[in-house]
Amino acid sequence: GQRVENHSNIVSEAALTGKTINIIDAYSSTAFKFTGTKKFDRGTGYRSKSFLTIPLKNAQNYVIGVLQLINSIEPQTGNVVPFGRDIEPLVEALASQAAVALENQNLIESQKHLLDSFVRLMAGTVDAKSPYTAGHCQRVPVLTEMLTQAACDSAKAPFADFSLNEEQWYELHIAAWLHDCGKVTTPEYVVDKATKLETITDRLHEIRMRFEVVKREAVIECQQKMLDGARNGVELKQILDERLRSLDDDFEFVAECNRGGEFMDEERIQRLQQIAGIQWTRTLNDRLGIAQEELNRKSQQPEASLPVKENLLADRADHIIAHDTVVYSADPLNPYGFQVEVPPHKYNLGEVYNLSIARGTLTTEERFKINDHIVQTIVMLESLPFPQHMEGVPEIAGGHHEKMDGTGYPKKLKGTEMSVPARIMAIADVFEALTAADRPYKKAKTLSESINIMAGMVKDHHLDGELFKLFLESGVYQDYATKYLESYQLDDICLDDYLAAD
């Protein structure tokens, strides 16, 4: 609706006009109602009389507040007297200083609000990149702060003396929300890789077509022999049928390998290599219409004359993609202290190489690329000019993949080299990942399964044992589970099984 200005209230009038107002006696004033003042006086027995109301103006001369002085006291008699006109300039000067202080405070709050909004925007962007990690960057801060509060509340060693002041809480808050900000550099098709041959698309479709070509070639070869009359037609048909059945079986095996559900032992790898040796005939130029980057890789090898026999599955030189920049962690003298084994290539798209992955769907190169998100997180956060009270943000955010025994990632820090908040975030990150129900590639684990896995990680010196004990004893795990886990995940656990072992 239309804005209505209130000129009957002295504070509103000062704010609207930007002028100082000096009232001798509120009860005899006809300019303003003083309704609130009189109600206050009736309730308290106080007698409000003289008023000096000064607008607070910032450097741009905008009114940002109002300073009001009530009941000037005459020092000799102690009586309430009007505010002298001669002191108005002095009070206005003091009000200007108050306005500067208020403006600075407002600016600090605005900057803090802007930073918070940007941090949440960044976390939301990371979560939105992939349905596989949806909500992770928003839930980890919640769990981190819950466990940190439990540590602050604990009266037992080793957390009896642990506490955070307001600035340290804010530092933890920012670090928790930005702990995976480096994932903005991780390609979605690597994070989301659901099969071994998947890149932007699943290359199994291309291999299926090659099998179809081989089958057609077998049919044509059989029919040609029948026409030549070199062998008995019935016998040739039996050989063809057996050949087609064998190819169908081979493709089913390749497709099964592509899923990544079973361990690839030596026997399976040998069969895969035998299938790879089956040849098919390519009659078209494979360098036409492709991207310049791929053409550059193919051009490193001499072009074969057509038609050419090619293996059904191949590990070619053009499948190797080199690192396009110097990897931070490849330099042993890097300024961040990263100690990471960097694979020789950025990616290896070799078909046999990918299908031979022992467990899961990721190659060594792809796993490095995913793990590299924490390196990028640290590099990104170290580049920001955090104020002194927030200088610990990179350490807290960048430590959640480290392990207590020093075998973690990316600095191989031991637990004694990490802050308590960093060790807390490691527990929060693992528990959230195990229990997350919004990951399309896996079913969320139950509460008991998750706690059991984490207990094993404590036994292997990957997670902090004291913090894990606090996680259980304080009930943080249960409070979080009640709010964020699905009903089917909320099974019973016997705490004594884990606390007694401690």
Model-derived regions: residue spans:
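Signal-transmission/dimerization alpha-helices at domain junctions
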Residues: 13-20, 66-69, 89-111, 125, ...
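Regulatory loop-to-helix N-cap segments in sensory/regulatory domains
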Residues: 62-64, 70-94, 362-364, 441-444
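A short, aliphatic-rich beta-strand micro-motif
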Residues: 49-58, 63-65
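Output-coupling edge of small sensory domains
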Residues: 54, 59, 70-72, 416
